[in-house]
From Swiss-Prot:
Signal peptide residues on this chain, from the entry's feature table: none
Record NCBIfam families: cinA_nterm, molyb_syn, PncC_domain, PRK00549.1
Superkingdom of origin organism: Bacteria
Annotated InterPro entries: CinA, CinA-like_C, CinA_C, CinA_KH, Competence-induced_CinA, MoaB/Mog-like_dom_sf, MoaB/Mog_dom
Pfam families: CinA, CinA_KH, MoCF_biosynth
Gene: cinA
Similarity comment text for this entry: Belongs to the CinA family.
Native species: Shouchella clausii (strain KSM-K16) (Alkalihalobacillus clausii)
Protein name stated in the entry: Putative competence-damage inducible protein
Gene3D superfamilies xrefs: 3.30.70.2860, CinA-like, MoaB/Mog-like domain
Amino acid sequence: MNAEIMAVGSELLLGQIANTNGQFISKQLASIGVDVYRHTVVGDNEDRLKIALQEAYERADLVILTGGLGPTKDDLTKETVAAFCGKRLVYDENALHEIEDYFKRHNRVMTPNNKKQAYVIEGCTVLANRHGMAPGMLCELEDGKKLALLPGPPSEMKPMFVNELLPKLLGATEQTEITSRVLHFFGIGESQLETDLLDLIATQTNPTIAPLAGDGEVKLRLTVKHADKNEAARLLDETETLIRKRVGSYLYGYNETTLVKETFLRLQASGLTIASAESLTAGLFSSELAAFAGASHVLKGSVTAYSNELKQQLLQVSSATLASDGAISEACALEMARGVKTLYGSDIAISFTGVAGPGVQEGHEAGTVFLALLLPGGKERVYTLSLSGGRNAVRMRAVKFGYFYLLEELKRSNGSK
């Protein structure tokens, strides 16, 4: 079965609200093996809604519409679908009682126009709304295709979809499921990753491989159709192995994770503590780590030192280094890390110094970053980065590289992949 999702509401086209319903429905349909081929957004206009509905109906086995079921004049979904199906709107006493009870529970006066919500399309299956007023509907047409109407507010739509519509769709779908595994990469661009995996992406059909980019990282979503979970795991593992052979050095995690989360969990599991000295990043590194419960057992402290005076006073950066190499240098980054490690007595220390932009500073172009990492056993690492983007992009990407390099070192020290 394939489906299309249609969101109805001029407020969506105007950008006043986001269409989160589409994402939710797509995930739910994917979990039961229904392919979603298209998302459409239509304003509160009967003629345009008719055209969009006709086009979607010709392409899909199932069309799900959200929104436009309310009591006002611009709520046109129900009327438009009824006309499309050649059906009448009929009064549903149960729906009316539910609406009346809703007003009573909330101590509100029911206005006459709310009775409009008790009308449903003749012959459809009514989907109860336990969290609002407008009932949903599932219309099954003579050619076997289906039209589902759901309310627009996510607080009403989601429970109605899960509790009312989904069980009815399960009986009509093939006994296949869709399982996805998301691989997270850092330190490689989307175009380079795709180039390295181009033949795999082009030839893989089950699982499929889809690159996803965002927030300075790249993800690969592996999606497999299956009737057996063990078979799905085997297919995903085989494909992941092929990917790892080519770009495994950039892989850092799976599914719902982040660089910060993976690093925090590694630090927590190893019992190691860290401190940061931040000039360029002004506390961004420590702030992200502090967002996790239990951070106090991992994060010893942080020093934000933009001025050279504070670098000398708090982090013991030597005046000789500042005079010869400058504050934006490998030498300064290393002394900053040593200073903060001594100050807090941490197992690990990290430091950031550089040029966020927009201009040149100490002869360095915007985007130049020096990052130092001090590790247990006396290991010292210094990295030089050349990052693109505006001030905030440079600072955020510098922090991500800091977490990536730290995570790689933690993995190596534990002997894990």
